[in-house]
């Protein structure tokens, strides 16, 4: 009898276990097959679960007949689970990005649609449509943003936003201001795109939170979290110009409380090319490596603690095709050779208190050893930054953000800028700028939100600096938002970082007066409307802006061809314009993003007769357009991308009235195509063509570099006043000048590569 009862009990347990059912699943991005962590799996009884860091989930008995899967930035999915023990959910990205979480506008994580400041979000999927080895090149297909090359020889550049020059744009990494001043000249080339989670762009004033360098715009590069990054990634690319780029990343655990994200980026281009036959390299030869490591620490109550570091080294040169390093610093063959050593440390620590308080910090050192012909430039910059932020909600209507910041800046070079003119001793420029800021988000009602902000900085020379800001958001509907932003800005120049031409040997720098700091007043209007019909979505993003500058510090190229004259503008400068972005998506197959910008950037100053004269600065276009068009065949795993930009004429710097080069650039365009094939959820291959039209500036001018055959001006003759004299050997009265550049000199090329990912 006992044996029978025991046998019956065992059989009953087995039957009971068999009748129980569990559902396991994974949520993946439909395009990249990358896991989607944090996705919500909602069941019919209103209970829900979240996917883990690898996109996986488990639902134990009882298993519902269907589930509803949602994730930020993706289109929702409703799926049946009948007679299934496992489920693979493919989510298609909602490219309208209306619900994307942003932090740059207010320093607080908030959905893009709810932010009072318009923040544009660009993910790695956007940058993959036209792959590039650096973030500098990746920005070329963003409307209103233009990477500008400033030298035909060394290919230094900066980033223009809405027609304003690079120094008006602040570039941060994870919100830390470590890419500035000296680093902004070459440092933008060393940020690996493989480790970027997203790029957030604020067009217009952001000085109230980020300080004086953000008066024209902000580019915040947000790196991936070690908690969500794949176990291993590899991105390898090569071009027909013999450019080679290897980008590796890996995430792993260190013990039970630390997660690490390690990335290594290597770029090599050593192929000398001279397609325009001026005996100078068309593209700077480069050899660089960047190593990045980010640690995330597990703490009680999920408090944040991260620590990251990056090391960057680059050896680049351009110049005479016969040049090699034995000629470095000499005056027989001209070459511009730059060695860059740079390290960065940054982190964030949420304080162990009941209030939401966090300390952010960064430190960086940038060393540049360079020769521009026979002109040496040895620069050394160190920046230490710390910021304590308190995020406090008061009642139902007010969200306060207050903080204190401290920035230490050290700068030294071998020029007279850091030399005591009385004693001849070296006198590095170093100073501390403390700052305080306060911001209040005031929710008037469900439709209206007002943001009020004020920042105070104390500059050692210019003393107290107030930068107020105000923003108003009006939610006309769930998919329709109107924003108004206004603020002021304050800026002091750094001569080398703002005019690299000062070191090319082409022009000498002259400062005729004590330079006062710039002041700016900005206003920005933004309107967003999103539409949805069945499998078609459309979104419209329109903005208008106006910026007014007093005491603007300008570089005058026109008064004397041998000088760059720095002075405060006796008058005013202004930038105004309109920008429009349109996104269209059809059934997860066809996607298009197109944008156009129309702008009027000018300065007004009095001439000798006392009359106001309005002029347009050099290298500033009146209009531009960008587009990204993609078509996907999901069953075949194929995606086709067509990207490009189009720029209107811009004024170019001429040496004299007899300079035969055109005074304005033609309408020009860079266009690219790419085909990518998803082999598996781990492997993807891609190939394409860059610069389809084979456009280079040499097509519209007799020469790009003036007197490239005499770069040291040994055969140039001058008159008593220092002006260049026309001779039979120099009929146009020119001197060596490589600053006549507005577009890349690199023509058409084929590229290809592979992307490999292990979850």
Where are these regions (language model features)?
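Membrane-embedded beta-barrel scaffold of Gram-negative outer-membrane proteins
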Residues: 257, 358-370, 475, 483, ...
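Short acidic/polar hinge/loop motifs at secondary-structure boundaries
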Residues: 57-60, 160, 176-203, 291, ...
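Short, acidic, small-residue-rich periplasmic hinge/interaction motif at the N-terminus
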Residues: 28, 42, 70-74, 82-128, ...
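Gram-negative outer-membrane beta-barrel transporters
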Residues: 443-446, 544-548, 568-655, 755-757
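Extracytoplasmic beta-strand/coil segments of soluble accessory domains associated
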Residues: 136-177, 197
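Flexible loop and strand-edge segments within Gram-negative outer membrane beta-barrel domains
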Residues: 269-290, 296-357, 363-383
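N-terminal periplasmic accessory domains that precede
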Residues: 85-90, 135-138, 155-160, 172, ...
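C-terminal beta-signal and adjacent terminal beta-strands/loops
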Residues: 646-653, 677-759
């Amino acid at each position: 009898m006992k044996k029978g009862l025991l046998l019956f009990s065992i059989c009953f347990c087995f039957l009971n276990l068999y009748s129980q059912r569990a559902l396991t699943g994974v949520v993946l991005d439909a395009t990249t097959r990358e896991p989607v962590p944090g996705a919500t799996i909602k069941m019919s009884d209103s209970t829900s679960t979240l996917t883990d860091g690898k996109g996986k989930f488990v639902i134990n008995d009882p298993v519902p007949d269907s589930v509803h899967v949602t994730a930020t930035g993706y289109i929702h999915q409703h799926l049946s689970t009948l007679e299934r023990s496992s489920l693979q959910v493919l989510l298609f990205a909602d490219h309208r990005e209306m619900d994307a979480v942003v932090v740059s506008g207010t320093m607080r994580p908030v959905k893009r649609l709810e932010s009072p400041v318009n923040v544009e979000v660009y993910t790695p999927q956007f940058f993959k449509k036209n792959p590039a080895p650096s973030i500098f090149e990746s920005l070329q297909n963003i409307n209103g943003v233009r990477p500008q090359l400033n030298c035909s020889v060394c290919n230094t550049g900066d980033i223009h936003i809405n027609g304003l020059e690079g120094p008006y744009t602040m570039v941060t990494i994870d919100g830390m201001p470590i890419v500035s001043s000296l680093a902004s000249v070459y440092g933008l080339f060393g940020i690996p795109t493989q480790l970027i989670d997203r790029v957030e762009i604020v067009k217009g004033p952001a000085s109230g939170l980020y300080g004086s360098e953000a008066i024209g715009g902000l580019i915040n590069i947000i790196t991936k979290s070690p908690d969500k990054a794949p176990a291993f990634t590899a991105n390898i690319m090569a071009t027909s110009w013999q450019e080679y780029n290897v980008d590796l990343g890996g995430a792993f655990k260190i013990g039970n409380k630390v997660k690490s994200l390690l990335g290594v980026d290597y770029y090599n281009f050593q192929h000398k090319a001279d397609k325009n036959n001026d005996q100078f390299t068309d593209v700077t030869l480069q050899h660089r490596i960047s190593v990045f490591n980010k640690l995330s620490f597990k703490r009680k109550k999920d408090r944040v603690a991260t620590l990251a570091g990056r090391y960057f080294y680059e050896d680049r040169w351009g110049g005479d095709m016969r040049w090699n390093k034995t000629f470095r610093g000499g005056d027989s063959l001209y070459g511009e050779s730059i060695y860059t050593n740079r390290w960065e440390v940054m982190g964030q620590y949420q304080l162990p208190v009941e209030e939401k308080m966090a300390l952010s910090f960064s430190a960086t050192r940038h060393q540049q050893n360079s020769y521009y012909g026979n002109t040496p430039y040895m620069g050394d910059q160190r920046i230490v930054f710390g910021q304590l932020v308190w995020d406090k909600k008061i009642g139902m209507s007010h969200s306060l953000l207050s903080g204190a910041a401290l920035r230490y800046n050290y700068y030294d070079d071998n020029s007279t800028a850091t030399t005591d003119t009385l004693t001849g001793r070296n006198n590095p420029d170093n100073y501390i700028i403390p700052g305080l800021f306060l911001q209040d988000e005031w929710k008037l009602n469900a439709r209206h939100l007002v943001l009020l902000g004020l920042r105070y900085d104390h500059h050692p020379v210019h003393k107290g600096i107030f930068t107020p800001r105000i923003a108003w958001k009006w939610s006309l509907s769930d998919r329709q938002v109107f924003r108004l932003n206004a603020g002021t800005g304050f800026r002091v120049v750094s001569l080398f970082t703002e005019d690299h031409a000062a070191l090319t040997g082409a022009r000498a720098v002259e400062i005729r007066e004590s330079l006062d700091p710039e002041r700016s007043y900005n206003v920005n209007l933004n309107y967003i409307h999103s539409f949805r019909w069945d499998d078609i979505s459309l979104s419209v993003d329109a903005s208008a802006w106006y910026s007014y500058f007093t005491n603007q510090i300008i570089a005058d190229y026109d008064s004397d061809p041998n000088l760059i004259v720095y002075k405060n503008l006796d008058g005013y400068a202004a930038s105004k314009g309109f920008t429009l972005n349109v996104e269209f998506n059809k059934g997860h197959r066809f996607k298009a993003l197109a944008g156009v910008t129309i702008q009027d950037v000018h300065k007004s100053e009095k001439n000798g007769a006392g009359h106001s004269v309005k002029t347009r600065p050099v290298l500033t276009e009146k209009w531009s357009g960008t587009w990204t068009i993609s078509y996907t065949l999901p069953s075949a795993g194929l995606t086709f991308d067509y990207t490009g930009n189009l720029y209107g004429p811009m004024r170019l710097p001429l040496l004299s009235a007899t300079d035969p080069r055109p005074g304005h650039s033609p309408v020009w365009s860079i266009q690219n195509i790419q085909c990518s094939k998803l082999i598996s959820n781990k492997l993807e291959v891609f190939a394409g063509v860059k610069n389809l039209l084979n456009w280079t500036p040499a097509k519209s001018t007799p020469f790009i570099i003036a007197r490239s055959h005499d770069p040291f001006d040994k055969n140039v003759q001058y008159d008593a006043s220092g002006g260049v004299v026309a001779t039979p050997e120099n009929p146009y009265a020119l001197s060596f000048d490589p600053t006549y550049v507005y577009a890349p000199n690199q023509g058409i090329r084929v590229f290809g590569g592979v992307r490999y990912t292990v979850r």
